[in-house]
């Protein structure tokens, strides 16, 4: 099974000002020598995912420098962490317009690796996770799309991507930042796609 990791570099990071004044959210230092982006990259590597792409756009120079200096695979492993920056092309004129647009515009670069599954992760969330379990569940359930969720309280729900699932775990309703809502399962920006 060929699994590729796709890590989202995020937007302006206004809630982390002044830390994001001159750097992308995933480049914010943690614990002295690490960056936020090191967590999802480590989750991928520790789960056996060796082909990783990082989508960037905002204040991304220090993030690019960190990736180039930190993540080097030997030439025989076939692994890599590659940065895919937003770019102007004949089909688009600049910045990514959200998560789906970032993935859509970058497909041509990671499809060269012919993945069976693409694991999409946020580049600025702190959690340790063995992705093997969710990949195994995705395969076992023959899903086209798997989205990780977490329960949230009503006060937090209105500012997140919120969904409702049926008894089989299938998504039946999804709303992005819906304001007041009775739905209390939030997307963690961890998704698997065939």
Predicted regions mapped to residue ranges:
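Unchanged
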Residues: 1-194
């Amino acid at each position: 099974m060929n699994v590729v990791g796709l890590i989202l570099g995020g937007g302006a990071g206004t809630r982390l000002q002044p830390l994001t004044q001159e750097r992308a959210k995933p480049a914010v230092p943690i614990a002295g020598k690490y960056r936020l982006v090191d967590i999802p990259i480590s989750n991928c590597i520790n789960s056996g995912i060796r082909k990783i792409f990082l989508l960037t756009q905002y204040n991304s120079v220090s993030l690019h420098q960190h990736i180039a200096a930190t993540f080097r695979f030997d030439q025989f492993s076939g692994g890599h962490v590659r940065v895919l920056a937003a770019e102007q092309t004949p089909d688009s004129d600049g910045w990514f317009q959200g998560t789906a647009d970032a993935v859509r515009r970058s497909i041509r670069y990671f499809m060269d690796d012919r993945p069976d599954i693409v694991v999409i992760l946020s580049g600025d969330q702190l959690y340790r996770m063995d992705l093997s379990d969710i990949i195994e569940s995705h395969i076992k359930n023959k899903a086209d799309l798997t989205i990780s969720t977490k329960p949230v309280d009503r006060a937090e729900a209105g500012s997140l991507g919120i969904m409702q699932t049926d008894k089989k775990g299938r998504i039946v309703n999804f709303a992005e930042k819906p304001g007041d809502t009775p739905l209390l399962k939030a997307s963690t920006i961890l998704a698997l796609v065939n």
